[in-house]
Amino acid sequence: MKYVFFVCSIFSVIVVFSICIFIFIYSLPIFKETGFLKFVFGMNWSPSSKHFGIFPMIVGSVYITILSTLLGGGFGFFTAVYISMFAPNKLKVILSQVIDLLAGIPSIVYGFFGMSVLVPFLKNISPNDIGEGVLASSIILAVMILPTITSITKYNLEAVYKYYYDGARALGNTHSQAVFGVIVKAAKSGIFSAIVLGMGRAIGETMAVMMVAGNAPFIPQDLFSYFRTMTINIALEMGYATGIHRSALIGTAFVLLLFILIINIILSLLKRNNLYFSFSFTSLFKKNKELKTDINNFSFKNYEMKMQTIKGDMLKYISIFATAVSTLFLVFIVVFILVRGLPHITLNLLFGKSNNSQMTLLPAIVSTSMMLFMSLIIAIPLGVFAAIYLTEYSKAKSKLIALIRIFTDSLSGIPSIVFGLFGMLVFANLLGIGRSILAGSLTLVLIILPSIIRQTEETLMSIPASLREGSLALGASKVRTIFQIVLPCGFSGIMTSVILSIGRIVGESAALIYTAGAVRYMPKGYLSSGSSFSVMMWMFSSEGLYINQTFATASILLIMIIVLNALLFFVNKKLKKDY
């Protein structure tokens, strides 16, 4: 069994290499014809004229990534500080649940909200009567990455050793001074990691931005300019592209992979540093060294100390304001979608026959269920077995284990649209499966596998070694110990990874359009094309005639996410074991 576990553990390495190799090979025709530098720095994208320059798309991607990270990162950081350091316990639980809920909302829902509410609002204040563009996309992306940044930052703040805080308070700091002067500084590596992860999601987002960007392949001139990102370029044109045009789109994905690689390298460098920076608490008072040593000079009558107190209080109130704005805005999105969508959920929409005259959700229900079953039945054993090898058979400081973990993290950072391209090239075309539910399911396996591995690995690592040693001392084999002691103890963590995977599958759209398909008809089997819930919602909104159905589908997606989060809360509260 050890070798089975090992093969499963290196699967992520094989997949990452395969994605890079296939994307590069299919990109070679455009690189040979135009040259890599001309392709990257070319200013004109006009497939009909055989001009393929993606620099405007690169600028657009970087532009909104920076803006959304500044906006979402700032609000996310201060929200995390308030929740972890200032909020009362009951409010902390509520806010944490709200943030976790909103982190699971599909991107297509955010995009539709932006198209329905944000774009009309910005159009009224725009100097050129345009609502779509850089500002709308940046706001939507900021809202999308805010829950991720908040959750990770909150975790890192709460992980700081308590004696750092106690030492700061003992030196005369207020609570606010201790938080912003000590705790935040000690956790800054983890905070930067959260922001970098947010950047990775922002630069790889497709569907939400496509609905509010305007999608013109030009360098944006101002906040209300139409623009196009690399991911949007792929999603818009891959459906009809052939020949060198198709190679140019795949080349765009290759350049996008290079950006993701750079972000992952930065993230790895941050993770190599110790989360907690060693520093002297007395450094907080280095400006006071010039003061007299008399104890009275450290009182709050001293002007400089008063300013430090005011600064700490100001940052505290900024945290309260950021939390209120973030939470209210995110809750408003959910309430708005539910209020507009729930009245339009009918039996005919759910279970009516979908044909040329009407579109219903029945094909999406069947297709999504089929993809859920197939992808989970493949990904769960792969992920759990990989985690078993990483925790039960790995050696301390093993370079191979470190390499596997790096590639697993890299796999989790690859944008959905790139997974979709890989699935189309390999599963649909190379293996001859075609656009089908099976091709979509296999693509989803690659998407959800990293989260299953890491969640299960973290759970298994938290199980005390004494339980394993006791089983082995009683004569049980290592494999029997794993299956009868370790895995049952880690059941809650495995269930958590499964629930999170279900949420990811239900909300996925970009990776499925060119693998599973985008059709309105009932699938006849796994080799038939089928549309997931999110893809069907995208089809509803694209038609322009099914606005009520789009709101209804968005409401159903939100209800699913709420139910999944409730299950997640139950699993963590009732099934998780404390050792």
Region annotations inferred by a language model:
Residues N124, V209-L257, S357, L512-L558:
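Interhelical loop and adjacent transmembrane-helix boundary motif
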Residues K154-K162, R169, V196, L236-N296, ...:
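C-terminal transmembrane helix and the adjacent membrane-cytosol boundary/short C-terminal tail
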Residues Y3, I25-S68, P88, L236-R246, ...:
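Periplasmic/extracellular loop-to-transmembrane helix junction in inner-membrane transport proteins
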Residues D100-L141, D409-L444:
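Generic hydrophobic transmembrane alpha-helix motif, especially the helices
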Residues L67-I99, I263, L267-Y276, S375-T408, ...:
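Transmembrane-helix boundary motif in ABC transporter permease subunits
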Residues I152-T153, H175-M211, Q455-T456, P464, ...:
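Transmembrane alpha-helices
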Residues V59, Y63-L71, F75, T79, ...:
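Hydrophobic alpha-helical transmembrane segments of multipass integral membrane proteins
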Residues P106, L171-G172, P415, L474-G475, ...:
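Glycine/proline-centered hinge or cleavage motifs at structural transition points of membrane proteins
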